[in-house]
Amino acid sequence: MSVATRDLETVTAQEVLAYAVDRFHPRLKMACSFQKEESVLLHMLTETCPDPRVFMIDTGVLFPETLQTWKRFEERFGVSIEVIDARSPDEPWTMTRCCGEAKIDALERGLIDVDAWISGIRREQGPTRAGAAKLEHDSRRGIWKVNPLADWSEKDLWRYIFEHDLPYHPLHDQGYASIGCAPCTAPGSGREGRWAGLDKTECGIHE
C-alpha cells in the first residue's frame, strides 16, 4: 500500500510523522508546549526530518520551569524553536483573554505559512480529545492536523522518554500531568489541573 493511501490509524507514531514530513514538509510545523508529549514528538521528528519547523506560544506567564525546558529541548534536539508572542502591550493580562483570543490569534500567526501542523494531543486526555484522528482536516484553519500520539497512553509516553533518556518538564515530577500558563495550572491528573475549579478544559486551540 502506498504511503499516500495507507490507513494512518494502523501505523506507528514514527510512521505517521514520516508520512507528514514526506507529504507536507517544509510547509509543516510542530506546536510545542514543552510537555511530555513534546519530549517524545521532538525526538521522533528530529530523527525523521533534519530541519523541522517548531514553534511555541509565549503568553508571558509561563512557568520558569517551562522556560528552562525550552532551553533543554533546543540543546538536546538541535532545533531553534520559533516564538509566537501572545502578549499584548495594550491590554492587561486576564485569564479570559489569554486562554481565548490571545492564544488563538498567536496560533493563527504561527500557522500562516503551513499546510499542516503537528500536535501532541491524545485521546485519553479527555472527552474533547477522544475522537482525535492521527491525521484530520483542521477545518477552522483550512489545513491538516497531525496527531501522531493520538492512541498513546500515559505509560507509553513515559516508557519512551525513559528508554531514550529524553529531557522532560520538571513539573511532571511534582504532580502536574498537564502544564499551561502558571496562573491557570495546578497539579492534577489528566487535564483536571488546567483551569482548576472552572468548567473549562480547553483554551480553544484544539477545539
Name each model feature, range by range.
Residues 1-207:
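Nucleotide-activated chemistry modules centered on ATP-dependent adenylation/adenylyltransferase
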